[in-house]
C-alpha cells in the first residue's frame, strides 16, 4: 500500500470525524464537548471554513500525527481551488467535471510542474425510479495511479501521490458548497468558484446548468487512482462522509471501486464486518475472466491472479440483500468475444456452472458492462451498440444478472477511465530523463 505523505501528519477538520475533532479540541485546551461538536456540524452544514478553533498548533513538543487524531494540532481547513469545469449533456441531465489544484508532494520529480498538481471529480445526474434527480459524485483517491491498466487514462500518468482524507472529503465539500451552491444562486459560492479566473463566466454557466433542486445522493470512488492503494485514507474519508454530525451520507450510498488488490480487499472487508459499515458498496474492475487476457490489460493480475481474487471475493462480508458489482469494460477486439461472455459468467457462477474453473460458491454479484471510453491516443475505439447488446445477452442467458452502465461525459473526457492529463506523464518523463546520467 502506498506510503503516507507528510501532508497527512497534521489533519484538518475535513479529515476528522466529529469525535476526533472534539478530542483534538480537548487536547488543545479549546472549547470541547457539545461546543466542539456543534461547531463541527456547522462547518459541514454551512460550508463556512472561517470560524474559530478550526486550526491550532499543538501546545506540546510531540509531533502531531494523523494516526492519533486526538493530538492537539489541526491544519487550516482548505478546500482545493477549482481551476476548470467541463460540461456535457446526458439523457438524465448535465454532467459536470471539475478540476482542483492540490500541493505536490515535497521532493517529487514533478517539481518542474510548479507547486500544484490537479485532481478531477465528476458530478453525474441520476434519475431514480420515482423520477427524482439526484447526483452521484465520482471522487479521486490519488493523483495519477500506479496500477498501469492499459485502457485507462489515469494509469498513463503514473502515480504522483495519494490524497489525504481531507482532500478526498474536500471534493465532496467543493461539489456541495461551491458548485451546487453557486447553481442555487449563493453569491459567496459563486465568488469561490470563479476567484481570479478568466473563465469565470463559463464556470458559472456550467454550474447553473445543474439542477438546483438535486442533492448529492451517492459517492463513488471511481475517479483518479486506486482506492485500495490508499486504503487507510479512503476508510477515514468514508468515516467522515458518513458521520451523522457531518455530511451524514448513508454508507449504503458509497461505493469503492478497485482493480482487485487482494491485500486491500482484506483490509476493507475487516472494516465492512463492523457495525455501521455493513452496506458499503464494492465494485471490482475485472474486465476479463482469464489470466492471460486480464494480465495483458491489467498488470495487477500478475500479482493477484483470478483465482486469488475470487477467493478473496468469496470472503467478502455481504449483509441482507446486498451484492457486489463485477465491472467489465468492454473493449473491441480484446474482451468482447462470445467466449469472454461465458468466462465472466463462470467467474460469477463458480461451482454452480459445470464449465467454470472456479469450484467455490456463486458470488452474490451482478455484472456491470461498461462500454469502453477511449483514452487519449487509445488503440481501441468504443464498442458498437450491437456488440454491447450481444455480449449482455450471452451473460443473461447464463442466468447472471447483468446491467449496462450508461455512458456519460465521454465528449469532455469525464466518463469512466478518462480522468487525468497525460501532460503530467510527459513532464515526469522529461524530469527523469534530465536527472539520469548521460553516456
Where do the language-model regions lie?
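Short beta-strand motif preference
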Residues: 98, 121, 137-139, 282-284
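Residue-level structural signal for beta-strand termini and adjacent loop
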Residues: 123-124, 233
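Conserved AdoMet/S-adenosylmethionine-binding subsite of the radical SAM
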Residues: 180-183, 200-394, 398
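Surface-exposed acidic, glycine/proline-enriched linker/cap segments
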Residues: 172, 192-204
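Canonical Radical SAM [4Fe-4S] cluster-binding loop centered on the CxxxCxxC motif
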Residues: 125-181, 185, 195
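Auxiliary Fe-S-binding modules of radical SAM enzymes
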Residues: 1-119, 125, 133, 180-191, ...
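Short linear Ser/Thr-Pro motifs
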Residues: 88-90, 140-141, 257, 285
